[in-house]
């Protein structure tokens, strides 16, 4: 039976779940995740304790509980459950209060209840920009892009662009490199004024073939030799043009995005 892990939060639980994933990924073990968001009352806290204790009895072992509960009373209630409770706020906020000699706001859901803030608006603008400039569908306002990702079809440009926009508020456009570009031996014309914003994504040809076969099985588009040709040409072009690039083959979207931000010296826009 898989160990049970509860993600308990007074908000969406995204922060707690992200932290839990980072910690649990260090162990060669699968876990059963139970998400318990929006614990914004004493009654809900007691109900959560009942769920945790039921899981302990059913599993025959204590669950693991990651919490980001700001309300002190609710937090103490959950801590009385039959579980290993890992309190993120107490572990990190209290030492920071002492170090900074400041009192934290202790406001529930502060991280994600930000629809009226400039940071939130920046993120929404970035998402809209990335959607409008996906796969080269628009050349308008490319000068406003923070970064323009280039690469062959299905090399990871779209998910990376959207992740940069959603997570960091970065205006990320993406533009495909196609066989016609390789025949000319030049970057697509609309990209010429924006060379300083370009960053390339490549991928292993066989992995690219697998991905394309899911979309167009048996086609020339997905054939290994065609994928090999496109990747070789794309990488050669990026080297000629002095465009920084990386292989997305064995990297997560998070790793790709972080590398791009570091390579182009772009500071995170949202926090």
UniProtKB/Swiss-Prot annotation:
Keywords in UniProt for this one?
A: Kinase, Nucleotide-binding, Serine/threonine-protein kinase, Transferase
Source organism's superkingdom? Bacteria
Catalysed reaction, written as an equation: [pyruvate, water dikinase] + ADP = [pyruvate, water dikinase]-phosphate + AMP + H(+); [pyruvate, water dikinase]-phosphate + phosphate + H(+) = [pyruvate, water dikinase] + diphosphate
What are the EC numbers?
2.7.11.33, 2.7.4.28
Which residues does ADP bind?
151-158
The record's top EC class is transferase
MF term (GO), any: ADP binding
Q: What does this protein do?
A: Bifunctional serine/threonine kinase and phosphorylase involved in the regulation of the phosphoenolpyruvate synthase (PEPS) by catalyzing its phosphorylation/dephosphorylation.
Q: Which family does it belong to?
A: Belongs to the pyruvate, phosphate/water dikinase regulatory protein family. PSRP subfamily.
**Protein name from the UniProt record:** Putative phosphoenolpyruvate synthase regulatory protein
Organism equals: Burkholderia mallei (strain ATCC 23344)
């Amino acid at each position: 039976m898989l160990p049970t892990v509860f993600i308990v939060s007074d908000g969406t639980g995204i922060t707690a779940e992200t932290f839990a994933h980072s910690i649990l990924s260090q162990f060669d073990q699968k876990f059963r995740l139970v998400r318990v968001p929006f614990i914004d009352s004493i009654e809900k806290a007691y109900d959560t304790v009942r769920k945790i204790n039921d899981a302990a009895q059913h599993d025959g072992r204590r669950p693991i509980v990651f919490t980001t509960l700001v309300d002190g009373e609710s937090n103490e209630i959950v801590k009385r459950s039959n579980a290993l409770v890992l309190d993120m706020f107490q572990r990190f906020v209290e030492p920071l209060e002492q170090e900074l000699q400041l009192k934290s706001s202790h406001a529930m859901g502060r991280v994600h209840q930000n629809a009226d803030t400039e940071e939130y608006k920046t993120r929404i603008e970035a998402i809209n920009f990335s959607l409008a400039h996906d796969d080269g569908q628009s050349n308008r306002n490319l000068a406003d892009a923070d970064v323009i990702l280039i690469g062959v079809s299905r090399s990871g440009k779209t998910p990376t662009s959207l992740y940069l926009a959603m997570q960091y508020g970065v205006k990320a456009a993406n533009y495909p490199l196609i066989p016609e570009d390789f025949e000319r031996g030049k970057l697509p014309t609309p990209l010429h004024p924006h060379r300083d914003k370009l960053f390339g994504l490549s991928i292993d040809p066989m992995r690219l073939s697998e991905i394309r076969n899911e979309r167009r099985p048996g086609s020339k588009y997905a054939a290994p030799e065609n994928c090999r040709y496109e990747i070789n040409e794309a990488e050669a072009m990026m080297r000629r043009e002095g465009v920084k690039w990386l292989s997305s083959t064995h990297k997560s979207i998070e790793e790709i995005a972080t590398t791009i931000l570091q390579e182009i010296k772009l500071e995170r826009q949202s926090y």
